[in-house]
Amino acid sequence: MPELPEVETVRLGLQPAMEGARFDTVALRRADLRFPFQPDFTDRLTGQTVTGLSRRAKYLLADLSSGDALLMHLGMSGSFRVIEPGGEATPGDFHHPRSEDRSHDHVVFSMSSGKTVVFNDPRRFGYMKLFRRAAIEDEPFLKGLGPEPLGNAFDASMLARACAGKKTSLKAALLDQRVVAGLGNIYVCEALFRAHLSPKRLAATLATKAGGPTERAEKLVEAIRTVLHEAIQAGGSSLRDHRQTSGELGYFQHSFAVYDRESEPCRTKGCGGVVKRFVQNGRSTFCCPKCQK
């Protein structure tokens, strides 16, 4: 599933095509994705102007001139592509062309900018929903999400408070969207490696007895921010389905230190350890047991 950097990469690609533009036509090529489209979805969206395009956790949010907001989730295999007025996909910054199967083009937005935005989703785990922007605090998909890891509210003190007293593992805590929003398996593994922390370590050890942040918490917050910034700059990680809106692949996967590197040498200078893979809560975890404690 796309994580924060992949969704942010998609947002940056959609922004020039959608922000400030009007939905001239909305074509739904099936009645549902993961969930059925709302009966008035097309009518509410057609003719509205996108006043802002943002991201919350792994969701894209398009604010509309009507006061509605369009929530979009990529699911497991969803992707957007932007087609220029001449019919060509927007050129990308990277090198790998997209393999298109247009039978999975389920939603087509024709924008007043002359560009066409297409949502393609082979597995159909993605979804879209309209809701009133003023009621965002009550929107079920967004309610209860933790702070953004790249936002000002996310710091070592906040993370220590969220983890204080927790008996769960550090990795499980970071994957809990109520603790911090948008992190997934890839970037949690990579951030824990950079902070030299074991994914098996108790989350509670990020807090002192008084509830303040430990040095571990400080290092982890810095590692999370750094990994996410680098991944966004690289266009995200393309392991299976992620594509940018240009149809190009991201390339942060070439910078992985531990994820998907089982039995390969640890990249910490002088460590000499080997990356191990094991299963935590049904997900593969990658780490170097020698330098992650």
Swiss-Prot record:
Q: Where, if anywhere, are coiled coils annotated? A: none
Record's catalysed reaction(s): Hydrolysis of DNA containing ring-opened 7-methylguanine residues, releasing 2,6-diamino-4-hydroxy-5-(N-methyl)formamidopyrimidine; 2'-deoxyribonucleotide-(2'-deoxyribose 5'-phosphate)-2'-deoxyribonucleotide-DNA = a 3'-end 2'-deoxyribonucleotide-(2,3-dehydro-2,3-deoxyribose 5'-phosphate)-DNA + a 5'-end 5'-phospho-2'-deoxyribonucleoside-DNA + H(+)
Entries under Pfam families matching the protein: Fapy_DNA_glyco, H2TH
Question: Cofactor: bound how, per the entry note?
Answer: Binds 1 zinc ion per subunit.
- Residues recorded as binding DNA, renumbered to this chain, are H104, R123, K166
The reply on keyword Zinc is yes
GO MF terms here are:
8-oxo-7,8-dihydroguanine DNA N-glycosylase activity; class I DNA-(apurinic or apyrimidinic site) endonuclease activity; damaged DNA binding; zinc ion binding
Which keywords appear in this protein's UniProt record, sorted alphabetically?
DNA damage, DNA repair, DNA-binding, Glycosidase, Hydrolase, Lyase, Metal-binding, Multifunctional enzyme, Zinc, Zinc-finger
Names of required cofactors: Zn(2+)
Active-site residues from the entry = P2, E3, K58, R283
EC annotation from Swiss-Prot or TrEMBL: 3.2.2.23, 4.2.99.18
Give the GO terms filed under biological process for this record. base-excision repair
- Start-end of FPG-type zinc fingers: 257-293
> How far does the signal peptide extend, from start to end residue?
none
Record's subunit section: Monomer.
What family does the entry list?
A: Belongs to the FPG family.
Its function, per the record, reads: Involved in base excision repair of DNA damaged by oxidation or by mutagenic agents. Acts as a DNA glycosylase that recognizes and removes damaged bases. Has a preference for oxidized purines, such as 7,8-dihydro-8-oxoguanine (8-oxoG). Has AP (apurinic/apyrimidinic) lyase activity and introduces nicks in the DNA strand. Cleaves the DNA backbone by beta-delta elimination to generate a single-strand break at the site of the removed base with both 3'- and 5'-phosphates.
PANTHER family the UniProt entry points to: FORMAMIDOPYRIMIDINE-DNA GLYCOSYLASE
Please give the name of this protein. Answer: Formamidopyrimidine-DNA glycosylase
Q: Which organism is it from?
A: Rhodopseudomonas palustris (strain BisA53)
Q: What is the lineage of its organism?
A: Bacteria, Pseudomonadati, Pseudomonadota, Alphaproteobacteria, Hyphomicrobiales
Encoding gene (name): mutM
